[in-house]
Amino acid sequence: MNQMTEKLYILFLFIGIFTVSCGRETSDRKDNQSPITIAGSTSVMPFTEKLAEYFMLDNPDYVIDVQGGGSTAGVQACINRTVDIGMSSRRLKDDEKSLRDITICNDGIAIVVHPGNPLNNLTIDQIRGIFNGRIKNWKELGWIDRKIDAVSREEGSGTRGSFEDLIMNKMEIDDGIMVQDSNGSVKEVVATDPYAMGYISLGLVDERVRGLSVDGVAPTTENIKDGSYKIERPFLFLINGTPDENTQSFIDFVLSKEGQIILKKEGLIDIL
Amino acid sequence: MAFQKENFIKFILMVFALSSLFFLFLIFAFILIEGLPLFLKVGLKNIIFGFKWAPTKGSFGIFPMIVSSFLVTFGALVVGGPMGLSCAVYLSEYSGKKMKMLLKPALELLAGIPSVVYGFLGVIYIVPLVRNYLGGSGFSLIATSIILGVMILPTIISISFDALMSVPKSFREGSLAMGATKWQTIYKVVIPSAKSGIMAGFILGMGRAIGETMAVIMIAGNALKIPTSILDPLRTLTGNIALELAYATGDHRLGLFSTGVVLLVIIMILNYMANFGIKKKRLK
C-alpha cells in the first residue's frame, strides 16, 4: 500500500513536470510573428501600452510586449539589443548617442498641488527654492504657516532628470525632500496631503491634483505647443541600427495621424 | 532492495537540504562580487560614513540610511516589543485552551499578510492620522515604526512564546510554593529564565524590521536626510535599493549593491546574536 502511494506520487510528479515543460513550448507560439519587445521609461510606458493595444487591434497577428524599467534601463537594453525599442523620457546623453532617437510626442511636467491649495502661480525661481530647501514654509508663498511637503522622484528617473535640467539649473534637490518612485506615487501623495507639492507628467494630471501656472503660464497642451509653457520634454523611442519590418510598422503607426490622435487624447502634445 | 531505496531517498533529501546552503552561498558571492569593487574604488569610510548620497554625481555616502534603518528598527521594537511580549506571556501563562486556539491561528495569519498590504493600510490610514493629529507630512519615522511594530509581532510572539513554554513547570511550582503570586512568579522567575529566548525573538524581530522593504518605501517618505524628529521622513537601506534599482546603471548600480553588502553584514550580526541567545538558553 505504502509503496503504491509512493509510486503514484512519483508518477504524478513526472506528469506534472512533463506537462509544464510541454505547455511552455506550444503556448508561446501563436503564429510565426516574433513579438516586438519594448522597455524603458515608466512615464512613456502607459502610452505605449495604449498604442500597442490599438495597433494589435488592427493587426491581430502582431504581438507587442511592453515593459517598464526606467529611461536609463531602456537605453541600456536598447544598446545591448535586448529590446527592439527602448523608451526614454529624457534626452540622450553624449555617450548614448549611438542610438537613433525618434520623438513620438512631447510631454509637459506639471507642478502639482492638492486641489484645496489656494495658490495658482509660482515663478520658476520659487519652485527651485522649494526643491532646493531654501523655501520651506507655505507662508513664504503667501499661504498659511505650514511646512511644504515637497515630493521629488528618485535618482535616475527620467522625470527627475528633466525636472533638474528645466527647473533646478544645476542646483541640487535638497536631502530633506521626500522621494517617491513613480509618477503614480507622487500623485497619490499630493492628492491626499493638502500641504504637498510635487511634479508629474502633465498627461496624468486629473481632478485629484491641480497643476500650477509657472511664471503666469498655465500647464495646458496649447501653451506647450506654442512654446509659452517651458517645462516640457520629449518622449522618445530608441532604436539600435535598422529596425526589422515589424518594429518599423509599429513606429510608423505611432507617428501616423491615427497614433498621434491617440496620444493627444491622452493629454500629450502631438508632433503633427 | 529496501535498503537501497532508503539510501536513495536519503541522498535526494540531502541534495535538497544542501541546495539551500548553495543558494545562500550564491547570494553572498553575488552581492560581494557586485558590491565590493565600489568599496575599493570610493573607500569604505566614504561609503559607510559619508553623508551625501548622489550616486549619479559620484557621492555614495549611506550613513544617513544606516542611521535611519536603525531608527525605524528601534521604533518598531518600541511599538512591537511590549505588545509582543505581553501577548506571549498571556498565551503561555494565562490563556485557556480556547483562547490559545483563537490567538495562535490569528497570529499566523498576521504573519502571512503581504507587506504591500501593510504598506497600503499605512498610506491610507496611519499616514493621514499622523498628518492630522501630529503634523508634518505623515510620511514619517513614527508611521513607519507603527507599521513595522505590527509586522514584527508574529516573530516576537512565537519565539518568546516558545521560550516561555520551555521554562520547566517545576520553576513555577517552586515559586508558587514559596508563596509568590502568579504575577510575581511570571515577573521574577519565568521571564528571567526565558530571557535569552525572548531576546532572540526581539533580535529576529529586528532583523525582520530592518529587512522590510515594500511597506517602508510606501510610508517612510524616503527623504535622504537623517530625521531630526519622529515626524520627519527618512530612507532606509532596503528602501534605497528598491527605489533606485530600476533606473540605476554603472557606478550607481554598484552603489546599490554596496548598500546591499552593508545590509547583509547587519543582518548577519543580528542573526548571529539571536542564535547565540538561543544556544545559551539550551546550555542552561
Model segments located where?
Chain A
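Bacterial N-terminal signal peptides
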Residues: 9-19
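Exported/periplasmic ABC-transporter solute-binding proteins
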Residues: 22-72, 76-82, 86-272
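Bacterial N-terminal signal peptides that target proteins for export
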Residues: 2-10
